[in-house]
Amino acid sequence: MTAPVVIRKYGGEALASPSRIRVAAEQIAERAARTPIVVVASARRGVTDHLLGLIDEVGGNRISRSADRVIASGEIVSAALLALALQRLGRKAVALDGREAGLLATGDWSRARLRRVQPRRIREVLTSGAIPVVAGFQARRRRGLATLGRGGSDLTAVALAAALGGECELVKDVPALYTADPGLCPAAQPLTRVSHAFLAELARAGAKVCHPRAAVVAAREGVPIRFTHFQHEGLATVVGAGDGSSPVAVVLRPDIALLTGQAPAAITGQTVRRLLVQLRRLDAGAEVTASRDEFGWRLAVFVTRDSRLESITIAQSLGIGLMVTGDADLSTVSVIGDITTDGWTGRLRAAIDTAQAEPVRLTRAGRRLLVAVPSGQGIPLLRALHREFVELAAEPEGVACSA
């Protein structure tokens, strides 16, 4: 039986220097000797920010066809360098940009929506015995090459895995998913297995582990994902269908604005749902809470500060009035997982008191609890919530596992 193809995506940190590119090439060559492999390359660390800076220096519009051509070049260079490193090891390798790889998109420049994958060229390269090395973060739009938003290489990898019926490996600069960002919370614990739904909640809450749309596509298509470190593959997190475990994680999302407003009773629930869909095209982590009475709708919307004005414009186009409320510099801290057990409100209050936090808004929906606080209170609240909901739990969820 032919082994399933593995789509292995390397993040920018893993490709940050020529020596790391050579190490990645050695890993890929060793893996390709055992199973068919497709590689997805991110831009090297710092390159995308450098390219955006160049666009700003010449006074260019970041959301334009020309800007996307500039920004997409970072991944194209990474893919070509990785292909060259593989060739030096005696392996046939072919670098492909998003168009050549058969990735098709619609929507706006800089945040295009991946709509379809036609991996004919990738299959041809695999059949020839070569290793396809695909530039992530980009796809073909009718009028040119468009980018998929920051973190879009994750989406490239998951979409290719779905189209090729393969497995996805995301090689990151952390060895696994954790119950919190270990850089912010030293007590964070690794997670060995989580469900697609849990990953999607993590990503949407602001965890920098996976592009939110990549998590959604993986869940919809049933793509198994393995998160691992580019230097330490012994520790990993496997993402798949619900496995019966009930982990809890705490996520900080900084630089958030709260928009509040009202809408007339004539506005339908479908319109409110459309607002959420359109806002998530702008900001994948946007959150909307809405309540309705005989006078109409009351809404609260959390978006990034950079997208608040465009969010207000989107709402206006749907007949919904929004405005920035109070302090526009907020952080949201989300507790994700099974938090419905007795006493959760007491643990929440204890964490808020410990952090000396002043919540601006508190929302609970399903398996997620969201607390909005002034930005300076975000990290203390993250640590306090982690202690209450993770560290004081009867048994820690995360343990190391072998590759």
Predicted stretch roles:
Residues P186-T192, E201-D255:
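Phosphate/diphosphate-binding glycine-rich loops and adjacent basic-rich segments that engage nucleotide
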Residues R91, G165-G166, V223, A284, ...:
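Short glycine/serine/threonine/alanine-rich loop segments
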Residues M1-A215, T304, T340, R367-Q377, ...:
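Nucleotide/pyrophosphate-binding catalytic subdomain
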Residues R44, V174-A176, E221, H229-G234, ...:
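Glycine-rich beta-alpha junction loops
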Residues V238-A403:
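A conserved regulatory-domain signal marking ACT and ACT-like small-molecule sensing domains
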Residues A41-T48, F227-V239, F295-G296:
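Terminal amphipathic helices with adjacent charged low-complexity linkers/tails
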